[in-house]
UniProtKB/Swiss-Prot annotation:
Signal peptide residues on this chain, from the entry's feature table: 1-22
Subcellular location: Secreted
Protein name from the UniProt record: Conotoxin Vc7.1
Record family assignment: Belongs to the conotoxin H superfamily.
Disulfides per UniProt: C55-C65, C60-C74, C64-C79
Keywords: Disulfide bond, Secreted, Signal, Toxin
Example of a GO cellular component annotation carried by this entry: extracellular region
Amino acid sequence: MNTAGRLLLLCLALGLVFESLGIPVADDVEAVRDTDPDEKDPSVHNSLKAVYGDCGGERCRFGCCKTDDGEEKCQHFGCP
């Protein structure tokens, strides 16, 4: 049990050492200097929107395709 306790303390000490070597987190004081590109780049947020198309009077999420009859339908409704 003595060895297990020493091993536990060694692991905790090494964990603290490696944690202190990590990248520091910005404080609220330095929030003005935030350089996170995801928050300021609008193209990141626009890429998550669904694109809708108009297929013969129907709004389709995944685009249109033509059936064998030449009729336009939404792609997810059994187009060939």
